[in-house]
Amino acid sequence: MSEQYFDPKLKIFALNSNKPLAEKIADAVGVKLGKTSVDRFSDGEIRINIEESIRGDQVYIIQSTSAPVNDNLMELLIMIDALRRASAKTINVVIPYYGYARQDRKARSREPITAKLVANMLETAGATRILALDLHAAQIQGFFDIPLDHLMGAPLLADYFLNHHLDENAVVVSPDHGGVTRARKLAEFLKAPIAIIDKRRPRANVAEVMNIIGDVKGKRAIMIDDMIDTAGTITLGAQALVDAGATEVYASCTHPVLSGPAIERIEKSPIKKLVVTDSIELPAAKRIDKIEQVSVGQLMGQAIKFIHENKPVSPLFKNRFHNEEN
């Protein structure tokens, strides 16, 4: 554990979605995780008990709303309510992976905006601040009427490629037009050019690669996205890059959702290595040799300390992507 933190009024609790990451975050802060129990009634209802006093404390709850999304979201809402009723001074919700983020707008008639609904529920339950990591859509920050600090996983992914000298003769590739800003920032850090894969998606979770904008021939292609779900986009893109003359293909993302046929597709693809963070806990079956995880524990732990001490989080991104105080 890091040096013990001096303020006894800072408490960190973890729910069930990603306890290994929660331990790393608490260790980075220098505190032990608070005592709480999460059980189920016989009919499946969630029961939470906070096993220590938090009256007047500044509390941080760590919970990714990853699969099973609805269970993890409900756990979080119930925990927030319990903390509010137990007189916590502040309730800071740390969400390494924000579920329902892809439903951030009405793409068709009569569709909900579920990302906004989740924001409403978190606020209504009693959250006073959100600490999020690589939200799928930037506008989700505006769905909240409480403070939200938004961290980025890209600097950690960039560190991996730099430390392994993979930035040499590299081109950073966005798998679609929507990810160009993310790719450009990574490219600036790696001092590499960018390329874009132009694709069409005929239906949900199915992607068709059309063409590549930019020069990838004879280069090491590094693809970056915020999340990989069924891996259709990333694997089709990798094959398109090889067909266009890339010497090798690496892929990276912050959130390894990896549902359905994702692992099989990655195994069969020309991707040499997929670099992801631990925002979502990977079960043993998904920890294949091609996947490398880097931890966001230190990053999020430092953010918690800065927030608790009323300091800007911008030093976490010094000389990288964020240069202004937040």
UniProtKB/Swiss-Prot annotation:
Active site as annotated: 199
InterPro entries cross-referenced by the UniProt entry: PRib_PP_synth_CS, Pribosyltran_N, PRibTrfase_dom, PRTase-like, Rib-P_diPkinase, Rib-P_diPkinase_bac
A GO-annotated cellular component: ribose phosphate diphosphokinase complex
GO terms, molecular function: ATP binding; kinase activity; magnesium ion binding; ribose phosphate diphosphokinase activity
Cofactor: Mg(2+)
Keywords: ATP-binding, Cytoplasm, Kinase, Magnesium, Metal-binding, Nucleotide biosynthesis, Nucleotide-binding, Transferase
Keyword Transit peptide: no
Residue numbers binding D-ribose 5-phosphate: 201, 225, 229-233
Subcellular location: Cytoplasm
Annotated GO biological process: 5-phosphoribose 1-diphosphate biosynthetic process; purine nucleotide biosynthetic process; ribonucleoside monophosphate biosynthetic process
Residues involved in Mg(2+) 2 binding: 176
Enzyme class of the recorded protein, top EC level: transferase
Residues the record lists as binding Mg(2+) 1: 136
List of residues binding ATP: 43-45, 102-103
Enzyme Commission number: 2.7.6.1
Catalytic activity: D-ribose 5-phosphate + ATP = 5-phospho-alpha-D-ribose 1-diphosphate + AMP + H(+)
Pathway in which this enzyme or protein is active: Metabolic intermediate biosynthesis; 5-phospho-alpha-D-ribose 1-diphosphate biosynthesis; 5-phospho-alpha-D-ribose 1-diphosphate from D-ribose 5-phosphate (route I): step 1/1
Annotated cofactor note: Binds 2 Mg(2+) ions per subunit.
Family membership: Belongs to the ribose-phosphate pyrophosphokinase family. Class I subfamily.
Role description: Involved in the biosynthesis of the central metabolite phospho-alpha-D-ribosyl-1-pyrophosphate (PRPP) via the transfer of pyrophosphoryl group from ATP to 1-hydroxyl of ribose-5-phosphate (Rib-5-P).
UniProt xrefs under PANTHER family: RIBOSE-PHOSPHATE DIPHOSPHOKINASE FAMILY MEMBER (PTHR10210), RIBOSE-PHOSPHATE PYROPHOSPHOKINASE 1, CHLOROPLASTIC (PTHR10210:SF41)
Subunit structure of this chain's protein: Homohexamer.
Alphabetical list of NCBIfam families matching this protein: PRK01259.1, PRK02269.1, ribP_PPkin
UniProt protein name: Ribose-phosphate pyrophosphokinase 1
Gene designation: prs1
